Amino acid sequence: EHPSKGEIVIAGKHIEKLNEKQLVTFRRERVGFIFQSYNLIATMDAVENVALPLSFRGMGKARRAKRAKEYLKLVGLERFMTHMPNQMSGGQQQRVGIARALVVNPQIIFADEPTGNLDSKTTMEVLRLMQKIVREQNQTLVMVTHDNNLASYADRRIRIMDGRIVGIETGGREALYEGNAEKKECNENESK
């Protein structure tokens, strides 16, 4: 979907100017997605679920499996590689989803309420894992959440109300606790 106004620039590309085929290619090559409901394929084990996006890139089966196993190890699931989604807990399924998003080495990861279906302990484990990995791999994570505690871990927070940007805050959790966070309230004219 194209924006009604303004522009979207990711990695120097004006996304709003791309046609449908170019958008598909851009998403496949540069974007990873983490979903609230995991979106794992029930008939595939963890390795197959993680390897799936690599098949769309034309990567051979053995190479896909090897890479998928590397990312499952990265998220701490080396013992669950042959497990089907219904044999894993919610936290384990979400880690498979994270591995699937990361396996394509995206520049940007979009996470839609990635911990919405998890208990508080697993939420913190998953959040720390995502934060660690994206920092180590120099990736951008864009996370949608209604949980202010989760949002406080972000380096930059954009508050949206009724489809308009109403505030922008910078500084991660450490800056918030130390009182060094920068806050900007947006008025009607700035948010257009």
Question: What role is predicted for each listed range?
Answer:
Residues 1-153, 157-160:
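ABC family nucleotide-binding domain
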Residues 164-192:
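Conserved beta-strand-loop-alpha-helix hinge in the C-terminal portion
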